[in-house]
Amino acid sequence: MAKLSLIEREKKRAKLVAKYAEKRAALEAIVADQSKSEEERYEARLKLQQLPRNANPTRQRNRCSITGRPRGTFRKFGLARNKLREIAFKGEIPGLTKASW
């Protein structure tokens, strides 16, 4: 199991990303807009750099919601592969069955 501090750090990052999502999207749109003047685009770029580093969604890491494991996490379920397997075999995930052909 991952340290609780790592799990809490990821939760904090998720909150920051949600908080600054609109502002970041607006600034990125200005930077990408070719009809704006170079000065406006430059100002938007500077404002983007002023946002907190952890407000960038690329800094987020998908973690298992049970164990906090950072690797082998299925996005659809939010679980690591081993926990997904355990829960699936117990039949606790509706519609999920082991493949057989």
Swiss-Prot record:
SUPFAM superfamilies to which the protein is assigned, alphabetical: Glucocorticoid receptor-like (DNA-binding domain)
Assembly notes? Part of the 30S ribosomal subunit. Contacts proteins S3 and S10.
Stated family:
Belongs to the universal ribosomal protein uS14 family.
Q: What is the lineage of its organism?
A: Bacteria, Pseudomonadati, Pseudomonadota, Betaproteobacteria, Burkholderiales
Protein's recorded name: Small ribosomal subunit protein uS14
**InterPro entries tied to this protein:** Ribosomal_uS14, Ribosomal_uS14_bac/plastid
* Signal sequence range: none
Summarizing the function annotation, the protein's role is: Binds 16S rRNA, required for the assembly of 30S particles and may also be responsible for determining the conformation of the 16S rRNA at the A site.
* GO molecular function per UniProt: rRNA binding; structural constituent of ribosome
Can you cite an annotated GO cellular component?
Answer: small ribosomal subunit
Q: Which PANTHER family match?
A: 30S RIBOSOMAL PROTEIN S14, SMALL RIBOSOMAL SUBUNIT PROTEIN US14M
Q: Which GO terms describe its biological process?
A: translation
* Species of provenance: Ralstonia nicotianae (strain ATCC BAA-1114 / GMI1000) (Ralstonia solanacearum)
> What domain of life?
Bacteria
Which key words tag this protein in UniProt?
Ribonucleoprotein, Ribosomal protein, RNA-binding, rRNA-binding
